[in-house]
């Protein structure tokens, strides 16, 4: 008996690395030292920083994976994975430098996982960061055949003097909401339950969703905000704080960028709720408060700017292809959302 008899194919693992090598190395830049396959990845800090601060983040995609696996569509999951990590560290003002991934599966399917890595590579290109390394674990008996899980890890850098920690935010500043591309990567356990209870399938089409299949709409990849936000910072827009709207929605995530004596008065009618959220609320009989507590509701990222830069910020973001709205104002309070 050998390792392969136990369900672990080492040769398939080597072949998989060879299959993805060229794609992964397309993300490399001058700061990457060495190639794929070492015990560690080497990255030289870029020059030009007086007091560089490294910012790290890690995340996964949750049960959105169940839909991808049911439909055998894995190409966009990698974009979701990168987005969940880089958008998080972006809130501090950090530029992503490099990304690492962890893929675990019951039986290594080279094409399936290559599709996942293709998405990770695309996400890295969209974030201007290197895919520095990763780990692929074949775990028979732990995951079923065709099942896999993913986790991502990223590191970025920001000048210490430019680190956004909320201390710059003042009463009267405004919250600018950047549109999401859809459900992103949170709330899928509730979505899956609604589909199950209603006896639906991922291939069902709905007029309210533009006659796309439910699976197509739900697998829309998470928006990556890195390039427009970093360009906004360079353009002179005075961004004082940022929030990535993930699990817990606006009520949980937006107050995280505030000081202890501040809240945000929100105007939930200042943007249009995406059709997929109307569909979820109707099909699942989900109360409005629960929807906002679970989903991004069409706002995937928020920046805090001075009131006199609100309109300018919105127009600038629109010029970059991002729809944006003034969704609220900073008021005195206790780090909570008022008005929902």
Swiss-Prot record:
Q: Which reaction does it catalyse?
A: 2-formamido-N(1)-(5-O-phospho-beta-D-ribosyl)acetamidine + ATP = 5-amino-1-(5-phospho-beta-D-ribosyl)imidazole + ADP + phosphate + H(+)
User: Which InterPro entries does this one have?
Assistant: PurM-like_C_dom, PurM-like_C_sf, PurM-like_N, PurM-like_N_sf, PurM_cligase
Pathway membership of this protein? Purine metabolism; IMP biosynthesis via de novo pathway; 5-amino-1-(5-phospho-D-ribosyl)imidazole from N(2)-formyl-N(1)-(5-phospho-D-ribosyl)glycinamide: step 2/2
Q: Which GO terms describe its molecular function?
A: ATP binding; phosphoribosylamine-glycine ligase activity; phosphoribosylformylglycinamidine cyclo-ligase activity
Its Enzyme Commission number? 6.3.3.1
UniProtKB keywords: ATP-binding, Cytoplasm, Ligase, Nucleotide-binding, Purine biosynthesis
Q: In which domain of life is the source organism classified?
A: Bacteria
What is a biological process (GO) this protein takes part in? adenine biosynthetic process
Question: Does the keyword Nucleotide-binding feature in the UniProt annotation?
Answer: yes
Q: Could you tell me where this protein is found in the cell?
A: Cytoplasm
Top-level EC class: ligase
Where the protein is mainly located, per its record? cytoplasm
Q: Does the keyword Ligase apply?
A: yes
What are its GO cellular component terms?
A: cytosol
Q: Which family does it belong to?
A: Belongs to the AIR synthase family.
Q: Which named protein is this?
A: Phosphoribosylformylglycinamidine cyclo-ligase
Q: Which organism is it from?
A: Crocosphaera subtropica (strain ATCC 51142 / BH68) (Cyanothece sp. (strain ATCC 51142))
Native organism taxonomy: Bacteria, Bacillati, Cyanobacteriota, Cyanophyceae, Oscillatoriophycideae
Q: Which gene encodes it?
A: purM
